[in-house]
A protein has these predicted regions:
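Short, hinge-like loop/turn segments at secondary-structure boundaries
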Residues: 51-54, 102-105, 128-129
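Small/aliphatic-rich secondary-structure junction motif
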Residues: 3-52, 76-85
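Short, well-ordered secondary-structure micro-motifs
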Residues: 18, 45-48, 96-99, 122-124
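A short acidic, glycine-rich active-site loop
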Residues: 53-68
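Structural beta-alpha unit
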Residues: 75-110
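Short hydrophobic/aromatic patches at helix-to-coil boundaries
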Residues: 1, 139-144
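Glycine-rich, Arg-bearing micro-motifs that act as flexible, cationic patches
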Residues: 109-134
Length: 144
């Protein structure tokens, strides 16, 4: 049925449900999992000398947080006996990074949460999940 499942993570509680669902599906189908955490690019402004955090500090913090989120998925998969690989990537549009990663890794299913950390912004500009659903050539399982 499925051979490689992509489960993006942002560390939210709802994403933890998507991870658990992906692990269960992987166990049932013998699939492996790829996980991905998308980091936001540095928020440059017109007044660049007034940045509250230096760019390298921002990048280091983003990587540390993203790597921790990926490690949580890797640990959960390992505890369940499911093969899993993970990555972090910087992207302006997380949905594009999700679809690019799915293609690069040869995934045949994306399992993701119905919403993530963006809260009200997602209601105003549309969620990453809806963009993945709209543009994905693969099946997408949305977990609520």
């Amino acid at each position: 049925m499925f051979q490689r499942i992509l489960v993006p993570t942002d560390g939210s509680d709802i994403t933890a449900k998507a991870v658990a669902t992906a692990i269960t599906l992987a166990k049932l189908t013998g699939a492996s999992i790829s996980t991905l955490c998308v980091k936001e690019p540095f928020p440059y402004s017109a007044i660049s000398e007034m940045q509250p955090v230096p760019p390298q500090e921002f990048y280091d913090a983003q990587e540390r947080i993203a790597a921790g989120r990926v490690k949580a998925v890797l640990d959960a998969a390992a505890a369940a006996g499911v093969a899993c690989e993970g990555a972090t990537v910087e992207a302006l549009h997380p949905w594009e990074a999700i679809l690019d990663t799915a293609k690069q890794k040869g995934c045949d299913l994306v399992v993701m949460a119905s919403h993530g950390r963006r809260g009200m912004a997602a209601l105003l500009i549309g969620s990453e999940t809806s963009r993945v659903l709209t543009h994905s050539p693969l099946p997408v399982l949305v977990v609520k």
